[in-house]
Amino acid sequence: MRAESRYTRVRGLLTHARVRGEGPPLVIVPGLGCASWMYARVARQLAPGRTVYAYDPPGHGLSAGRPGSPRTIEGLTNHLAAWLTEAGLGRVPLLGHSLGAEVIFDLAARHPGHVSAVIACAPTGIPENPSVRVQLGRLLLDLPRERPGLFLPALAAYTRSGPARMLRLAQNQSEHDTGPLLPHVRAPTLLLDGTHDPVIQAWTLEAICAAIPDATVREIPGGTHALTDSFPQTVARYTLDFLREAKA
């Protein structure tokens, strides 16, 4: 089942999504500096049951960007909301990875009409707001645990996004307080946690789960931070089972 690129003009920017599969839509929102092509493995596993949109934020992947933008998680969230409207997707489930999970929490709280369910895969930045230095140190610990085949696609994605954009967003993540928004997330929520992920602290998942009215946590034994790449079948199975139960 081949993927196709679709472009939608959003606020003057051509915004890209890699689309594959059949069935109701499911949107993947990438992590910091990541690109749609880094989620091909999990998209293939999800595609038999869903039409999967692997979304590229502005300045990421194949989406156009502007110098110095986006600067904030709020800006990422607002563009995602506008893209969902322009793409005609309506109210959909979203799977966010790493920083992308924080973006979809923001979206679910501030734009609830766009979100039918939340799947937060290795969510970062909540509620501890680690500094850029701490984030980088944890990612370096995670690097040797990841699948070697992810290295070149990730390098291409980070080169496309650029260090300046990534640094701005990482700095904003260390300041952005999503915690107070979590009780306003009314969509059913699944939190996915890899037991070998040094980037995420177990207590943060517990805090998120306690704050969101309808949330559950599933652990993936041996899972690294890039769960969608290292355990695509498990992530897809948990996601599809959850969406069936939630009727989303």
Language model: regions and residue ranges:
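Acidic catalytic loop of the alpha/beta-hydrolase fold
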Residues: 195-200, 225-226
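Hydrophobic, aromatic-rich cap/lid helix
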Residues: 151-180
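Catalytic histidine-centered segment of alpha/beta-hydrolase-like enzymes
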Residues: 223-234
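Conserved hydrolase catalytic core segment
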Residues: 90-129
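Alpha/beta-hydrolase fold catalytic core
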Residues: 1-26, 47-50, 89-90, 160, ...
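Short beta-strand/loop motif that positions the catalytic acidic residue
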Residues: 184-185, 191-193, 197
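Active-site loop/oxyanion-hole signature of alpha/beta-hydrolase fold enzymes
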Residues: 10, 18, 53-95, 237
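Conserved HGGG/HGGXW glycine-rich cap/lid loop of the alpha/beta-hydrolase fold
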Residues: 13-62
